[in-house]
């Protein structure tokens, strides 16, 4: 026959609840850590979008404008006789 006391049952149930709570806490901590890593990666991408991309665009555009005004918009040279 089974000799199962109420205190033993409560102890086993308590152990199951404790193991479940520990697993739940570990899961919450791991998910929070992974979410913080994902947030850091997104912030780095945002920094790339807001800082580096416009800077590169402005650099390329200003280089194009410099070439355009420096090469194509030159004033005609005056001949020596015109002076």
Curated annotation (Swiss-Prot):
Sequence ranges on the Intravirion membrane side: 38-79
Taxonomic superkingdom: Viruses
Segments passing through the bilayer: 17-37
Pfam families linked: CoV_E (PF02723)
Claim: Ligase is one of the keywords in the record: no
Protein location: Host Golgi apparatus membrane
Example GO BP: disruption of plasma membrane integrity in another organism
Chloroplast found in the keyword field: no
InterPro entries referenced in this protein's UniProt entry, alphabetically: E_protein_bCoV, E_protein_CoV
One GO cellular component term: host cell Golgi membrane
Keywords tagged on the record: Apoptosis, Host Golgi apparatus, Host membrane, Membrane, Transmembrane, Transmembrane helix
Membrane topology: Single-pass type III membrane protein
Virion surface side: 1-16
HAMAP family: BETA_CORONA_E
Quaternary structure and interacting proteins, as annotated: Homopentamer. Interacts with membrane protein M in the budding compartment of the host cell, which is located between endoplasmic reticulum and the Golgi complex. Interacts with Nucleoprotein.
Function as written in the Swiss-Prot or TrEMBL entry: Component of the viral envelope that plays a central role in virus morphogenesis and assembly. It is sufficient to form virus-like particles. Seems to be important for creating the membrane curvature needed to acquire the rounded, stable and infectious particle phenotype. Acts as a viroporin, inducing the formation of hydrophilic pores in cellular membranes. Also induces apoptosis. Plays a central role in virus morphogenesis and assembly. Acts as a viroporin and self-assembles in host membranes forming pentameric protein-lipid pores that allow ion transport. Also plays a role in the induction of apoptosis.
Homology family: Belongs to the betacoronaviruses E protein family.
Protein name: Envelope small membrane protein
Gene name of this polypeptide: E
